[in-house]
Amino acid sequence: DFGSAQFEQEYMCSFEAAILGSFYGTELAAARSEGRICDVAYDPDLPVMTVWDIGYSDDTVILFVQIIANEVRIIDTYSSNGQNLAHYAGVISGKPYEYSRHVLPHDAQAKTLAAAGRSVYEQFTKDYDLKNVTILQNRNTEMQGILAARHLFSRLWIDQGQEDFLNALGQFRREWDDDKKCFRDRPVHDWTNHFADALRYLSWVWKEPV
Protein backbone atom coordinates (compact mmCIF):
# COMPACT_ATOMS: atom_id res chain seq x y z
CA ASP A 1 0.00 0.00 0.00
CA PHE A 2 0.96 3.70 -0.08
CA GLY A 3 2.43 3.75 3.44
CA SER A 4 4.53 0.60 3.20
CA ALA A 5 5.81 1.49 -0.28
CA GLN A 6 6.83 4.95 0.89
CA PHE A 7 8.56 3.50 3.98
CA GLU A 8 10.48 0.94 1.92
CA GLN A 9 11.59 3.55 -0.60
CA GLU A 10 12.63 6.28 1.80
CA TYR A 11 13.96 4.38 4.81
CA MET A 12 14.89 0.90 3.61
CA CYS A 13 16.28 2.10 0.22
CA SER A 14 14.24 -0.58 -1.51
CA PHE A 15 14.29 -0.54 -5.31
CA GLU A 16 11.74 -3.36 -5.39
CA ALA A 17 9.00 -1.30 -3.75
CA ALA A 18 6.35 0.02 -6.09
CA ILE A 19 6.88 3.59 -7.28
CA LEU A 20 4.29 5.78 -5.57
CA GLY A 21 1.46 6.47 -7.98
CA SER A 22 2.69 3.80 -10.42
CA PHE A 23 0.07 2.74 -12.95
CA TYR A 24 1.54 -0.72 -13.48
CA GLY A 25 3.36 -1.46 -10.22
CA THR A 26 0.87 -4.08 -9.04
CA GLU A 27 0.72 -5.73 -12.45
CA LEU A 28 4.51 -5.85 -12.76
CA ALA A 29 4.83 -7.38 -9.30
CA ALA A 30 2.29 -10.05 -10.23
CA ALA A 31 4.09 -10.79 -13.51
CA ARG A 32 7.37 -11.23 -11.63
CA SER A 33 5.88 -13.47 -8.96
CA GLU A 34 4.15 -15.62 -11.59
CA GLY A 35 7.35 -16.04 -13.60
CA ARG A 36 6.10 -14.11 -16.64
CA ILE A 37 9.17 -11.87 -16.73
CA CYS A 38 11.76 -14.36 -17.83
CA ASP A 39 13.77 -15.50 -20.84
CA VAL A 40 11.18 -15.15 -23.63
CA ALA A 41 12.89 -16.48 -26.72
CA TYR A 42 11.93 -15.84 -30.34
CA ASP A 43 9.87 -18.70 -31.76
CA PRO A 44 10.80 -18.97 -35.47
CA ASP A 45 7.52 -20.81 -36.13
CA LEU A 46 5.51 -17.71 -35.19
CA PRO A 47 5.36 -14.33 -36.94
CA VAL A 48 6.41 -11.16 -35.15
CA MET A 49 4.25 -8.05 -34.96
CA THR A 50 5.83 -4.68 -34.21
CA VAL A 51 4.01 -1.94 -32.32
CA TRP A 52 5.46 1.57 -32.43
CA ASP A 53 5.39 4.82 -30.56
CA ILE A 54 7.05 7.34 -32.85
CA GLY A 55 8.73 10.41 -31.41
CA TYR A 56 9.54 13.19 -33.83
CA SER A 57 11.82 15.15 -31.50
CA ASP A 58 12.31 12.53 -28.77
CA ASP A 59 12.24 8.77 -28.25
CA THR A 60 10.81 6.22 -30.65
CA VAL A 61 9.96 2.83 -29.14
CA ILE A 62 9.34 -0.43 -30.98
CA LEU A 63 7.89 -3.54 -29.33
CA PHE A 64 8.48 -6.91 -31.00
CA VAL A 65 5.57 -9.18 -30.13
CA GLN A 66 4.55 -12.78 -30.73
CA ILE A 67 1.07 -14.03 -29.88
CA ILE A 68 0.14 -17.64 -29.27
CA ALA A 69 -3.23 -18.63 -27.82
CA ASN A 70 -3.79 -16.21 -24.92
CA GLU A 71 -0.11 -15.38 -24.42
CA VAL A 72 1.16 -12.00 -25.61
CA ARG A 73 4.94 -12.32 -25.66
CA ILE A 74 7.16 -9.24 -25.80
CA ILE A 75 10.35 -10.85 -27.05
CA ASP A 76 12.35 -7.74 -27.88
CA THR A 77 12.23 -3.94 -27.75
CA TYR A 78 14.13 -1.10 -29.35
CA SER A 79 14.32 2.59 -28.49
CA SER A 80 16.35 5.53 -29.72
CA ASN A 81 16.02 9.25 -30.37
CA GLY A 82 17.19 11.73 -32.95
CA GLN A 83 17.23 9.08 -35.67
CA ASN A 84 15.67 9.24 -39.13
CA LEU A 85 13.24 6.72 -40.57
CA ALA A 86 16.00 4.98 -42.51
CA HIS A 87 17.59 4.06 -39.18
CA TYR A 88 14.43 2.41 -37.87
CA ALA A 89 13.78 0.64 -41.17
CA GLY A 90 17.30 -0.73 -40.86
CA VAL A 91 16.58 -1.97 -37.34
CA ILE A 92 13.54 -3.87 -38.63
CA SER A 93 15.38 -5.44 -41.56
CA GLY A 94 18.36 -6.28 -39.37
CA LYS A 95 16.37 -8.52 -37.02
CA PRO A 96 16.05 -12.25 -37.81
CA TYR A 97 12.26 -12.12 -37.55
CA GLU A 98 9.47 -12.94 -39.99
CA TYR A 99 6.93 -10.14 -39.62
CA SER A 100 3.14 -10.30 -39.75
CA ARG A 101 2.56 -6.54 -39.61
CA HIS A 102 3.89 -3.24 -38.32
CA VAL A 103 1.43 -1.16 -36.29
CA LEU A 104 2.07 2.59 -36.28
CA PRO A 105 0.27 5.19 -34.12
CA HIS A 106 -2.42 7.36 -35.67
CA ASP A 107 -0.12 10.38 -36.06
CA ALA A 108 2.06 8.41 -38.49
CA GLN A 109 -0.44 9.29 -41.21
CA ALA A 110 0.07 13.05 -40.74
CA LYS A 111 1.89 14.70 -43.63
CA THR A 112 4.92 16.82 -42.71
CA LEU A 113 6.65 19.66 -44.49
CA ALA A 114 10.06 18.24 -43.59
CA ALA A 115 9.20 15.13 -45.62
CA ALA A 116 7.93 17.07 -48.64
CA GLY A 117 4.32 16.62 -47.61
CA ARG A 118 4.53 12.88 -47.03
CA SER A 119 3.55 10.94 -43.92
CA VAL A 120 5.67 8.47 -41.95
CA TYR A 121 3.35 5.76 -43.25
CA GLU A 122 4.02 6.76 -46.86
CA GLN A 123 7.77 6.92 -46.34
CA PHE A 124 7.94 3.51 -44.68
CA THR A 125 5.84 1.79 -47.33
CA LYS A 126 7.25 3.54 -50.41
CA ASP A 127 10.84 4.47 -49.55
CA TYR A 128 11.74 1.55 -47.28
CA ASP A 129 9.39 -1.12 -48.61
CA LEU A 130 7.96 -2.17 -45.26
CA LYS A 131 5.12 -4.61 -45.85
CA ASN A 132 1.81 -4.88 -43.98
CA VAL A 133 2.05 -1.49 -42.30
CA THR A 134 -1.17 -0.48 -40.54
CA ILE A 135 -2.30 2.64 -38.71
CA LEU A 136 -3.84 2.28 -35.26
CA GLN A 137 -6.72 4.72 -35.04
CA ASN A 138 -6.97 6.84 -31.91
CA ARG A 139 -10.17 5.43 -30.45
CA ASN A 140 -9.60 5.81 -26.72
CA THR A 141 -8.46 8.43 -24.24
CA GLU A 142 -5.06 8.03 -22.63
CA MET A 143 -6.63 6.84 -19.37
CA GLN A 144 -8.85 4.34 -21.19
CA GLY A 145 -5.75 3.00 -22.90
CA ILE A 146 -3.92 2.66 -19.59
CA LEU A 147 -6.86 0.69 -18.19
CA ALA A 148 -6.82 -1.56 -21.26
CA ALA A 149 -3.08 -2.14 -20.77
CA ARG A 150 -3.65 -3.11 -17.14
CA HIS A 151 -6.22 -5.68 -18.26
CA LEU A 152 -3.78 -7.01 -20.86
CA PHE A 153 -1.02 -7.49 -18.28
CA SER A 154 -2.24 -10.90 -17.08
CA ARG A 155 -1.54 -12.23 -20.59
CA LEU A 156 1.88 -10.61 -20.98
CA TRP A 157 5.15 -12.50 -21.00
CA ILE A 158 8.08 -10.07 -21.14
CA ASP A 159 11.67 -10.95 -21.89
CA GLN A 160 13.72 -10.13 -18.81
CA GLY A 161 16.47 -8.58 -20.93
CA GLN A 162 14.25 -5.63 -21.87
CA GLU A 163 15.41 -3.59 -18.89
CA ASP A 164 14.60 -0.11 -20.21
CA PHE A 165 11.06 -1.20 -21.04
CA LEU A 166 10.54 -2.84 -17.64
CA ASN A 167 12.01 0.12 -15.77
CA ALA A 168 9.82 2.53 -17.72
CA LEU A 169 6.66 0.58 -16.94
CA GLY A 170 7.58 0.51 -13.26
CA GLN A 171 8.20 4.26 -13.15
CA PHE A 172 5.23 5.31 -15.30
CA ARG A 173 3.13 7.11 -12.72
CA ARG A 174 0.39 9.60 -11.94
CA GLU A 175 1.04 13.30 -11.42
CA TRP A 176 1.02 14.44 -7.80
CA ASP A 177 -1.24 17.36 -6.82
CA ASP A 178 0.64 19.05 -4.01
CA ASP A 179 -2.26 21.35 -3.17
CA LYS A 180 -4.81 18.56 -2.76
CA LYS A 181 -2.24 16.02 -1.53
CA CYS A 182 -3.41 13.35 -3.93
CA PHE A 183 -2.54 11.87 -7.30
CA ARG A 184 -4.12 13.32 -10.41
CA ASP A 185 -5.82 11.09 -12.94
CA ARG A 186 -3.16 11.69 -15.57
CA PRO A 187 0.42 10.53 -16.01
CA VAL A 188 3.67 12.38 -15.53
CA HIS A 189 5.04 13.09 -19.00
CA ASP A 190 8.70 12.09 -19.08
CA TRP A 191 10.94 9.44 -20.65
CA THR A 192 8.63 6.63 -19.49
CA ASN A 193 5.75 7.77 -21.67
CA HIS A 194 7.06 6.42 -24.96
CA PHE A 195 7.40 2.89 -23.60
CA ALA A 196 4.04 3.12 -21.85
CA ASP A 197 2.38 4.45 -25.00
CA ALA A 198 3.70 1.51 -27.01
CA LEU A 199 2.19 -0.87 -24.44
CA ARG A 200 -1.07 1.06 -24.58
CA TYR A 201 -1.17 0.69 -28.37
CA LEU A 202 -0.46 -3.03 -28.01
CA SER A 203 -3.47 -3.34 -25.71
CA TRP A 204 -5.64 -1.84 -28.46
CA VAL A 205 -4.20 -4.21 -31.06
CA TRP A 206 -4.98 -7.17 -28.81
CA LYS A 207 -8.67 -6.34 -29.07
CA GLU A 208 -8.49 -6.56 -32.85
CA PRO A 209 -8.18 -9.75 -34.91
CA VAL A 210 -4.48 -10.53 -35.16
Language-model segment annotations:
Residues 3, 9-12, 16, 67, ...:
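Residue-level marker of positions within ordered structural domains that often coincide
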Residues 21, 203-204, 208-210:
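Charged phosphate-binding loop/patch that engages nucleotide di/tri-phosphates or the phosphate backbone
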Residues 41-79:
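Acidic, glycine-rich loop-and-beta core segments that form the ion-binding/anion-interacting portion
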